[in-house]
UniProtKB/Swiss-Prot annotation:
One of its GO terms (cellular component) is chloroplast. One of its GO terms (biological process) is mitochondrial translation. Part of the 50S ribosomal subunit. Keywords: Chloroplast, Plastid, Ribonucleoprotein, Ribosomal protein. NCBIfam families: rplP_bact (TIGR01164). The keyword Ribonucleoprotein applies. The keyword Ribonucleoprotein applies. Belongs to the universal ribosomal protein uL16 family. GO terms for molecular function: rRNA binding; structural constituent of ribosome. The lineage of its organism: Eukaryota, Viridiplantae, Streptophyta, Zygnematophyceae, Zygnematophycidae. This is Large ribosomal subunit protein uL16c. The gene is rpl16. Pfam families: Ribosomal_L16 (PF00252). It is found in: Plastid, Chloroplast.
Length: 141
């Protein structure tokens, strides 16, 4: 699963999910993509589950790019612990995703295979997503 090798600080504030994604909202590497339509935290486990679903369906055909990285630590307190005595220890990592963000990109496969693979990965995500593709430029005659 994805997580940073090292961070400057162990713990972070929760923050807010305001607005739409201004970066990472266009297809850069592949021909097909899965785009987020809602704001959410996506855990490293969910990212990995989506990656496995896509690669399993495509049978190692084509290439896959993961466009999000979980760089935010989420802390948790032990069960049945009294209030106070500081913030809990980091338990897992999440990627902060705003609407419009590209989650996965794919190329080297047909559109039907890419659409089906992305649909399976979309079921693993906690948010609504949409399948997008880059417009193919007409050949110059």
């Amino acid at each position: 699963m994805l997580s940073p090798k090292r961070t400057r600080f162990r713990k972070q504030h929760r923050g807010r999910l305001k607005g739409i994604s201004t970066r990472g909202n266009r297809i850069c590497f592949g021909r097909f993509g899965l785009q987020a339509l809602e704001p959410s935290w996506i855990t490293s486990r969910q990212i990995e589950a989506g990656r496995r679903a896509i690669t399993r369906y495509a049978r190692r055909g084509g290439k896959l790019w993961i466009r999000i990285f979980p760089d935010k630590p989420i802390t948790m307190r032990p069960a049945e612990t009294r209030m106070g005595s500081g913030k809990g220890s980091p338990e897992y990592w999440v990627a902060v995703v705003k609407p419009g963000r590209i989650l996965y990109e794919m190329s080297g496969v047909s559109e039907t295979i890419a659409r089906a693979a992305m649909r399976i990965a979309a079921f693993k995500m906690p948010i609504k997503t949409q399948f997008i593709k880059t417009p193919v430029l007409a050949t110059i005659q």
